[in-house]
A protein has these predicted regions:
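Histidine-centered metal-chelating micro-motifs
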Residues: 56-59, 97-107
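Glycine- and acidic-residue-biased ligand/ion/polar-headgroup-sensing regions
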Residues: 64-83
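Bacterial N-terminal signal peptides
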Residues: 6-15
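Short N-terminal segments immediately surrounding and downstream of signal-peptide cleavage
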Residues: 21-44
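Ligand-binding loop in jelly-roll beta-barrel domains
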Residues: 101-122
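Conserved short histidine dyad/triad with adjacent acidic residue
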Residues: 47-63
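Short acidic-glycine-tyrosine-enriched beta hairpin
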Residues: 83-101
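Positively charged n-region of N-terminal signal peptides that target proteins for export
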Residues: 1-4
């Protein structure tokens, strides 16, 4: 839990430096993927989401502003970008990953349930 608080503090500091990184005209992951994403915290600086993807689960297309992923429970994921690009990643429990704004959908192609904390940066 201490790691999460440190991560949130660092992200708040990044928000001060980098300002607004919101994706305009984007599909909100909390709305389009409400069955797999839950809101944990929202304020003027960040929005923290928890995403859970069971094996074989697929999200709908959505967008994120700049954000950080903290991997609670790892697994293998395939990301499909709005531009048609397809990438695969093997998330390991405890990984912390920074991502620039993007529009994508993801699917769990592994055999374990993936759990992620997503910290989206606001202005």
């Amino acid at each position: 839990m201490k790691r999460i608080y440190i991560l949130i503090f660092l992200l708040l500091q990044m928000g001060v430096v980098y300002g607004d990184a919101a994706v305009t005209g984007a599909q909100d992951p909390l709305v389009v993927n409400s069955e797999s994403i839950n809101l944990k915290l929202e304020n003027s600086r960040v929005r923290v989401l928890e995403a859970t993807l069971a094996p074989g689960a697929k999200e709908k297309m959505h967008s994120h502003p700049a954000y950080v992923i903290y991997v609670i429970a790892g697994g293998k994921v395939r990301n499909h970008g709005a531009d048609g690009a397809v990438t695969e990643a093997n998330f390991k429990t405890g990984d912390v990953i920074y991502r620039e704004p993007l529009t994508h959908w993801a699917e769990n192609i592994g055999d374990t349930t993936i759990r992620l904390e997503l910290v989206e940066l606001k202005n």
